[in-house]
Curated annotation (Swiss-Prot):
Family: Belongs to the enolase family.
Binding-site list for (2R)-2-phosphoglycerate: 163, 339, 368-369, 390
Subcellular location as annotated: Cytoplasm; Secreted; Cell surface
Described purpose of this protein according to its UniProt entry: Catalyzes the reversible conversion of 2-phosphoglycerate (2-PG) into phosphoenolpyruvate (PEP). It is essential for the degradation of carbohydrates via glycolysis.
Protein name: Enolase
Pathway(s): Carbohydrate degradation; glycolysis; pyruvate from D-glyceraldehyde 3-phosphate: step 4/5
Coiled coil: none
PROSITE patterns: ENOLASE
Phylogenetic lineage: Bacteria, Bacillati, Bacillota, Clostridia, Peptostreptococcales
UniProt GO cellular component terms: cell surface; extracellular region; phosphopyruvate hydratase complex
Keywords annotated in UniProt: Cytoplasm, Glycolysis, Lyase, Magnesium, Metal-binding, Secreted
Reaction equations catalysed: (2R)-2-phosphoglycerate = phosphoenolpyruvate + H2O
Positions of the catalytic residues: 205, 339
Length: 428
């Protein structure tokens, strides 16, 4: 019933107008799985390789025809005839077929496209929603949104150094209420910015991208928007940051350059800076507060702040069990950001989440800045009971698609749906 009959890939566009790969898997039963692979702007050096063509005369070198060809001519013949429910077997076969530690031969984008499409096809063949197929009967926890409403860094053309300023509706009773709270705050933030004569254009992930006097001013206008909406900062809504500090790090001088503020800081001074911010504002989570290779700095940050806030490793861990294991052994961070295309298969993604949870780390499921209408990560978040999701502002269809899928899942789960609010930070 779930035997793979055909696999087909094509080149499509992502939310930034860059080419990406779409894969379709057809089963003998008539079931079809279709998925579009995302792409990042601020990427970790240790991520699996996203294969691009490099032909400057076509899509400025960003075409993915090589990845498409690898699916259609190399991967497809190997997996046609296999059972789509054998996810681990298929993923491991593709990893072996690639034969490199970072999937640079076939491309993580090619491999992930097939991996996700296989899972979707198998779920359809069995008549199950994807979250239940991947997570089983216990998949019932809706994630707290970590909604990016103000963009800086590599996600915007402004003078704000910190890449993402996010809100988390920890006081909501359920997911739909939490989403509504975030949307209301987002619209009120637009009003606050307009009143101050600031720009309301948006960045890659739909958050506003104004020029501000400092990174702290971003927190100030967000708190103002929360209060204007009628919610209490720190009670109903908490704040989260993605600093993307690797983008700020001068490898030669071992210093962090906050160009927007015209200052340079050591790792210890960055930790001091974060401590000042969390003492003044209701910040519950900081992602990539230091560079991906500044392990000593990360250890210091975890020692200083790890009992107060969630410290998330994105570029640090890149959804990779080897790097996560190193972090766990060193006592580095207390949370991992999960991006499927950083590692390249469903199986390896689930392995990373399992390792994190066993070590008492939280797991945050995340989109990329280059997204599409594909909503797979919404199902993954519920499948693994992650409890948190990053998928941008309520302003672009590529972001809203994930929120809408979570609303559908909440409806499907009915009274069995869970929403933990602040209890998702179980290790603080």
């Amino acid at each position: 019933m779930s035997i793979i009959r055909d696999v087909y890939a094509r080149e499509v566009l992502d939310s930034r107008g860059n080419p990406t790969i779409e894969v379709e898997v057809y089963l003998e039963s008539g079931a079809i799985g279709r998925t579009i692979v995302p792409s990042g702007a601020s990427t970790g050096a240790f991520e699996a390789v996203e294969l691009r063509d490099g032909d400057k005369g076509r899509y400025l070198g960003k075409g993915v025809q090589k990845a498409v060809e690898n699916v259609n001519q190399i991967i497809a013949p190997e997996i046609i005839g296999l059972d789509a429910v054998e996810q681990v077997v298929i993923d491991e076969m593709m990893i072996e077929l690639d034969g490199t530690p970072n999937k640079s031969k076939l491309g993580a984008n090619a491999i992930l496209g097939v991996s996700m499409a296989v899972a979707k096809a198998a779920a359809e063949a069995l008549g199950l929603p994807l979250y239940q197929y991947l997570g089983g009967v216990n998949a019932k926890q809706l994630p707290v949104p970590m909604m990016n409403i103000l963009n800086g860094g590599a996600h915007a053309d402004n003078n704000v150094d910190i890449q993402e300023f996010m809100i988390m509706p920890v006081g909501a009773a359920n997911f739909s209420s939490g989403l509504r709270m975030c949307v209301e705050i987002y619209h009120n933030l637009k009003s606050v910015l307009k009143e101050k004569g600031l720009g309301t254009g948006v960045g890659d992930e739909g958050g506003f991208a104004p020029n501000l006097g400092s990174n702290e001013e971003a927190l100030q206008v967000i708190v103002e928007a929360i209060e204007k909406t009628g919610y209490t900062p720190g009670v109903d809504v908490k704040l989260a940051l993605d600093v993307a500090a690797t983008e700020l790090y001068d490898e030669t001088e071992k210093l962090y350059r906050l160009s927007g503020e015209g200052v340079v800081k050591t790792a210890a001074e960055m930790v001091d800076f974060y401590e000042e911010l969390i003492n003044k504002y209701p910040i519950i989570s900081i992602e990539d507060g230091l560079s991906e290779e500044d392990w000593d700095g990360w250890k210091l940050m975890t020692e200083r702040l790890g009992k107060k806030i969630q410290i998330v490793g994105d570029d640090l861990f890149v959804t990779n069990t080897e790097r996560l294991e190193k972090g766990i052994k060193q006592g580095t961070a207390n949370s991992i950001l999960i991006k499927l295309n950083q590692i390249g298969t469903i199986t390896e993604t689930l392995d990373a989440i399992e390792m994190a949870k066993r070590a008492g780390y939280t797991a945050v499921i995340s989109h990329r800045s280059g997204e599409s209408e594909d909503s797979t990560i919404a199902d993954v978040a519920v499948a693994v009971n992650a409890g948190q999701i990053k998928t941008g502002a309520p302003a672009r269809t590529d972001r809203v698609a994930k929120y809408n899928q979570l609303l559908r899942i909440e409806d499907m789960l009915g009274f069995t749906a869970k929403y933990l609010g602040e209890d998702v930070f179980y290790n603080l």
